[in-house]
Amino acid sequence: MNTVDATVGGVTVPVDTGFIVHNPLNFPNIVALFRTLGVATEDSDMSFAVSARGGAFEYAGGLGPAGIFAQPANLLSPRFWGMLGNILRFNARARGALALPDDVSFGAWLDREGFTGAVRDDHLLPMAAAIWSASTGSILSFPASSLFRFLDAHGLLGVFGRPQWRTVSGGCRSYVSALIRDFGGRVHIGAPVATVTRHGDRTALELGTGDVREYDAVVMATHADRTLAMLRDADDGERDVLNAFRYAPNRAVLHRDPAFMPRRRRAWASWNYVTGASGGYVTYWMNRLQNIEAVDNLFVTLDPPEEPREVLAAFDYEHPQFDADAVGAQKRLGGIQGRNRAWFCGAWCGYGFHEDGLKSAMRVARDFGVTAPWETEPPA
C-alpha cells in the first residue's frame, strides 16, 4: 500500500502506486475488513490493452468492440482473428489443466499444447506479466496449474461472469488510517527490526538503533527473504521454506507522460502492457482505475525503459516470483508455524496479493485464539 499526493497545477489528488483494486469474489476478507472499518470504496475498471512492437499492433479488452478493434487493420488480419480464436481454445484447455503437477511450467505447457505466435506473445504472456508485475521470461517458469487456478478464480478463463472491481475512495491510506485508529496496542514508527533471536522462553528483537526488546513470540509479516535475513537462529525447516522464495525488483514511476501508453488513444485501458525495442513494461492509467477527474494523464509505469517526462514520484518495490520451488514451499509453511515462537505471514503465502497477506495473517491470529470480527469459518 502506498498512496501519494500528486499535485498538478495547484490541484492535489491521492494516487495509489501499490495496492489499487479488489473485488468481492476474490478479496472477501479485504472487503469484510473495509466494511468493518467503514472504509468507502467505488467501482473501478479492469480493462487491459496490449501495445506491441512500438505500437505496430494494438488492441484493448474490456472496452467493447471499439477497444478490440482500436487498430482498424485488425478487422482484416488473419493473425488477429487467429489470436482471438486461440484465446477461447486456451481458456478451455486451461480449465481442464487445473490439477497439473507443480513441476509442469507454464512455458512447457504452452509448447506442448501448441500455443505459439500471437496468442502467446501478444496476449497470454503480457496479461500474466501485468498481473504479477513480472517479466514474460519469469512467467514461463511459473507452475502452469497454479497460474490456471488463479485465472479461473478471477473469471479470466471465460468471456462472461467477470467480477466488478473496486478501488478505495481517497486512496488505500484510508484503510491504514482506520486500522491504526481502531488499534488497541502500540504502533512503533521508524523502528526497523535488524535481527530476531530466540533464546530460552523469550524472543529478542534488535532494532536498527541497536536497542533490544524482548517478547514472548514474534509474527514476521515481511518478505520471505527479508524474514530469513532477520531470523538469525533459523532452523533447517524455516530455512528450507523461506529460502525458496525469489523476489524481482520493480521501479514504479508516477508520471504524466502519455508516451508510455498505447499509441492509439482508443486502445488506452486501465492496464497497458507495452513492448518495444527495449523490452516490455506495464503502465496503469490511474485516472481510469481510480476515477480521477481533477487531473488528467496520471500514469504509473513499472520499470520504464527510459525516464518519463513530468515524473511526480518514484518507488522501488519487490514482488515474489511463484516458480515451482516457491509453490512447493507454501505447502510446507504450516510445518514451521509457531514451532519456535515464530509465525510467518505475508502475500507470499498465496498468490502475492493483499487478500493473500490478510488470509495468512488471519491463520496466524487463529493460532493465538483470535478471530476477525467478520470471520465465520477458518480462512481458506
Predicted feature locations:
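Conserved N-terminal glycine-rich FAD pyrophosphate-binding loop of Rossmann-like flavoproteins
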Residues: 1-21
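Conserved flavin/dinucleotide-binding core of flavoenzymes
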Residues: 3-4, 60-66, 267, 279-380
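Mobile amphipathic helical/loop "lid" adjacent to a hydrophobic cofactor/ligand pocket
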Residues: 13, 23-144, 148-149
